Amino acid sequence: MRRKRSRSAAAAAAIALLCGAATAGGGNPIAAADDSLAAQGFRTQADGSRIVDTTVLDERNLRLQVYSAAMGRTIDIDVQRPADASSPRPTLYLLAGAGGGEDTATWQQRTTVLQFLAGKDVNVVQPVGGAFTYYTDWRSADPALGVNKWQTFLTEELPPLIDRALGTNGTNAIAGLSMSGTSVLQLPIAAPGLYRAAAAYSGCAQISDPVGYNFVRTVVSAGGGDTANMYGPQGDPLWAANDPYLNAEGLRGLELFLSTGSGIPGQWDTLDGPYTLPGVGGLANQLTVGGALEAASNYCTHNMQARLNQLGIPATFDFQPVGTHSWGYWEDALVASWPILAKGLDLPA
């Protein structure tokens, strides 16, 4: 028990140092860590979740290890601190695609958006994990993907820990691409008031119709998972219950941005380009698989536009005439979405 307590105290002190936790008279921040906002993040919550460790990567970045009681395992959380952390700042939850940030297909490795966001007064929080899960609560454990209660983790367990550890102002936005382009619409519906803005890049909101269902099944099966363990067989009521298109009323009041390409090759679809996998095979995959996925996303996003218009819910839609399901277009989309996210976060555009 003493060893565990010491580890948590050291980790709390590390966050206190990075987050600029002040001490009276310029005293030792390690000695004061238990009284700091950072240390509070290490207190076990009523649900059993807690921050168990942290690694400071540099003066702006750290990795937290957060125990999820709902899933019974520890999740890595990458954090980029604001340009100015002298006062409480808002938080942008930035989700990965199908790989869950566990592979090389990450915002850090494929884009420069972290550098772009480094100039903003916002905490950027990226969960590492959840590959092929849609960041949702699965109805049962999956033989390949295990126990998944990502909705519970992202909406109930993680935010209060982040708020206490980083001393945020409690204002949140969420953004994601491809697989998580669906999740970032589901999560605000599931947790009203948690987020003020959401941006979905190349997602598919309409998951319970045949096109959307097959889109989800294709992604989940790529990781060896079975969607029957997620929401049940096709037509099960859980599919409709988790469909952002059908439940779009829950998005009212949010600042919304949705974007997609057409599936037709564009400027970032070039041989050995900066956003293309190496070689002819990499480009061919981007043009064929990436083209088909983006065309499906385009279909879903147009339908979502019609749905929001029907409900009188304002949103910004960015339909590009070209573009495949690939990183160059997602980087462009995130930059384009920043004014919308910033408005929700009460930050300058």
Regions found by a protein language model. Give the residues of each.
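Non-catalytic cap/lid and distal C-terminal segments of serine-dependent acyl enzymes
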Residues: R2-A13, C19-A349
